[in-house]
Amino acid sequence: MSTVLSERRRFLKEILLHKAREMLARAAELLYAEGAEEVLAFASVLKPEGFDEHSDVDIAVKTLTEEKKLSVERKLEDIFVDIAFDVVFLEDEIRSEIRERIQREGMTWKR
């Protein structure tokens, strides 16, 4: 019985991760269209075993104007309708441990 439940849970996690990555691809498309120089994903969305219903999608963005940042955040909310997300803009002041984590494990999301 527990094998059936664990398999079901694993299957649902895979579906959720796939959905999150599809949303990430749409978000990256939007960000590049708005002028981002680079879009990076980091943290649990890159780790299939670590992504679950409590996870969010972490995105780092390089080079967007201040006015674009605000409008982009609103548009991202429309993309990530039922999955939480965090976006950081690399030209802003961010905590050093977050910046180091992005540099260490961030993956450029292609256009």
What are these language model-derived features?
Residues A60-K62:
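Short hydrophobic/aromatic beta-strand micro-patches
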Residues M1-L40, L46-E53, L64-R111:
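Catalytic core of pol beta-like nucleotidyltransferases
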